[in-house]
Amino acid sequence: MEYTKYAAVGHFKCHRTLDCKKYPVVIVGRKEYMLDVQEMTVWSSLAWRILSRSQIAEAYLKLTRGLSFTSRRTLDDCIDRLVTRGLVAEGHGGSEYESLYDLLSCLYIAPVSANPFLRFGAFLKLWIWDGAPFSKAIRLFSRLKHSAEERQIVRLANQALLSSAELIKCAERGVRTLRSDAQLMDCLYDDELTTSENLPILMAASRQARPVSAAIANLYLHKQIVFERC
């Protein structure tokens, strides 16, 4: 049996037209992407969630209840389109953990707390688009207690844009502070064979893979980070 997991990539931002009408965009790697209503609904159902395709369908039905829009695309086609556009990530595996690792390993980590624009965009997404009560959305600005692994991930991710696989290798090497780009390269790519493309494969067998992956997933589910691409 193969498992598949999905998560949203990037962060939400709300723009205004000249006549003051609001429209949402998703920003990934400093590039803005326009989404139609169906795409935005699917992306929103995955923001700070890690879901299977059937779970996406349930969340999508809940979000579209009461909305009056039609789309010629099926939900499956919409999900596939978002994956192709790089706005949704997917991971496959023979177990729940393997699919989670495959999902996370190539994604980059951006702490929401490090960027006030990310945090404010996340607040707007919850309040305006998702319709969450103001009192619930404002909790995004409160600080949660993190585990030691989570604190270390946030500390390193505040110093450099790192993928999950790179964070696993940092944990394996005991790196707690990044003093320079040279130190980072020496830690991550200290031989001729290791590249950013094959590092996720190499780190899958690391003893740090499970605890770091679990910590990253927990940070994401608690709205402390967003996923990025380079």
Question: Would you name each region that the model predicts?
Answer:
Residues 13-14, 27-31, 139:
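Short, flexible segments with low predicted structural confidence
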Residues 21-26, 30, 35:
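A short, structured beta-strand/loop element
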Residues 1-20, 89-90:
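N-terminal leader segment of winged-helix/HTH proteins
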Residues 33-230:
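Long, charge-rich, low-complexity alpha-helical segments
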